[in-house]
């Protein structure tokens, strides 16, 4: 029996260009913020309401390099990963926490800048084994193939 499930699936737009850095042993790390939006109609006023959530996403190794090369602010992506909370101390010695998503799979859902949509997976943070699956016509959504994805682009500010 499973001890628990820690899985996150998100579709959203990047809020900024990816920031790619390298660890001392040469592993790539990319950090992005991803906006996801929910819309609903207010029962009392009938007005359409929207709430945008911002998520911190971390990519590692080859997946981080792909993110740095192909994604830009506003890029629409699908990610799968797991939640992780980190703890550190600030300058005053106060404990601080942040929760982020460690991505192990990413699909580009648009082809801004002339690039191809693609599916990429990274199932290792330590660099021991990376998995990258090249896009195929049966796996890759096209720019006009958003029929299964709700259209949240209308009110996102980028």
Swiss-Prot record:
One cellular component term from this protein's GO annotations in UniProt: nucleoid
PROSITE patterns: SSB (PS50935)
Composition-biased stretches (Polar residues): 129-142
Motif Important for interaction with partner proteins: chain residues: 153-158
InterPro entries linked to this entry: NA-bd_OB-fold, Primosome_PriB/ssb, ssDNA-bd
Taxonomy, superkingdom: Bacteria
NCBIfam families linked: ssb (TIGR00621)
Name of this chain's protein: Single-stranded DNA-binding protein
Gene name of the record: ssb
């Amino acid at each position: 029996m499973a001890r628990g499930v820690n899985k996150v699936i998100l579709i959203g737009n990047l809020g900024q260009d990816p920031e790619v850095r390298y660890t001392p042993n040469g592993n790539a790390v990319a950090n992005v913020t991803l906006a996801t939006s929910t819309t609903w109609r207010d029962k009392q006023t009938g007005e359409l309401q929207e709430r945008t959530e911002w998520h911190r996403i971390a990519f590692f190794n080859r997946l981080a390099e792909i993110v740095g090369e192909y994604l830009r602010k506003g890029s629409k992506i699908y990610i799968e990963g797991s939640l992780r909370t980190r703890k550190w101390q600030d300058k005053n010695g106060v404990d601080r926490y942040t929760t982020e998503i460690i991505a192990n799979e990413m699909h580009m859902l648009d082809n801004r800048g002339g690039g191809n949509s693609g599916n990429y997976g990274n199932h290792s943070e330590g660099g021991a084994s990376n998995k990258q699956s090249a896009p195929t016509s049966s796996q890759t959504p096209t720019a006009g193939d958003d029929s299964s994805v709700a259209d949240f682009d209308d009110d996102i500010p980028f």
